[in-house]
Amino acid sequence: YPKGTMLKVYERDTGKYLGEIEQARQTYSVVGNMNEYQVTIGETTFGGRPELADSTGIIDYGSLLYIGLQRSRTAREAIKIMTDLVQQYGYYSEGESFTIADPNEIWIMEMIGKGPGIRGAVWVAVRVPDDCISAHANQSRIHQFDMNDKENCMYSPDVVSFAREKGYFNGVNKDFSFSLAYAPLDFGARRFCEARVWSYFNKFTDNGKDYLPYIEGKTNTPMPLFVKPKHKLSVQDVKDMMRDHYEGTPLDISNDFGAGPYKTPYRLSPLNFKVDGQEYFNERPISTQQSGFVFVAQMRAHKPDLIGGVLWFGVDDANMAVFTPVYCCAT
């Protein structure tokens, strides 16, 4: 693009026009959530403290994701581009968790704004070890992180000091938890969000029983950001997990009172409801009928980018979807 070209930014969820930013001189092809260099970015919204939203920002989470894909060749480069963008133009959305990956690395980055009229965001990004798996499901997952490990951890310079300034944290740096400071846990975050992460960890590790009390509200000790699985996961393993309804666990919704004679794993919204003044809730599984689409990203360093990146894409509920492979350089 010629120098000085501007890019109009529209909010992903509503189509609302947010403003203009300077376009990069060169951008890369993007198919779904993967670009031509196999860089892949996914997200879940955790919301966090409502007073930190900034409606004057230009960059919303969806634009941040796709502009990051258009401009990056590695996961680390995507993190720098995304954080530079919100620092320059302001962050419009609520708290967000991003999975940012390339053929060699996977990072979890969490970000939240600083409040009305305050440009920028506080954020932290942690690299997932090669022998581990991680997950996030609409609740902030990063607690303590090693501020001295520059190779595996990146963060905004004020991520701790801003929390102190706002009164969210008053301990020593090593005890700082991004999640507790910026997205305090409530019942919904634990049972409807963290429970989905628990199901994933329960499926592929032997630690599920140790983490279940946290999901049930019996302890406040959180699950780790990442864990070592019992075996290396395949593409099929991840597809199957996206179809999960807590089958075979204490949270299996095909066995509760709402399952009916056919043991259906589906429930109508809302998750909470009242009968005769008594409040009840349905479990919120990974697979749900409210889904618009689902994907599994396969990134392969041992193959050329042209055929190395495959986006296994399906529409609607993952349990009903057919995963169709699309190469990252498809036109």
Residues covered by each model-derived region:
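A contiguous strand-loop segment
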Residues: 1-60, 81-233
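Second-shell loop/turn segments in exported
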Residues: 51-55, 63-72
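Accessory, solvent-exposed terminal regions and/or long lumenal/extracellular loops of proteins
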Residues: 202-278, 284-286
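Substrate-recognition/cap regions that form aromatic- and gly/pro-loop-enriched pockets
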Residues: 262-331
